[in-house]
């Protein structure tokens, strides 16, 4: 089952991206390196509630 998740920057804590994930394949929280427009750099983004 695919669900919507929100990704938040680990440095400034702002929620920048929405994406979908498959809970069966990724039961843990996602973490991706993406560009943060508020920090003006690439930073790790973690899945939030």
Curated annotation (Swiss-Prot):
Coiled-coil positions: none
Annotated GO biological process: translation
Gene3D superfamilies: Ribosomal protein L33
Keyword vocabulary terms for this entry: Ribonucleoprotein, Ribosomal protein
Keyword check for Ribonucleoprotein: yes
Protein family: Belongs to the bacterial ribosomal protein bL33 family.
Matches recorded under NCBIfam families: PRK00504.1, PRK00595.1, rpmG_bact
Protein name in the entry: Large ribosomal subunit protein bL33
Source species of the chain: Clostridium botulinum (strain Hall / ATCC 3502 / NCTC 13319 / Type A)
Gene name for this UniProt entry: rpmG
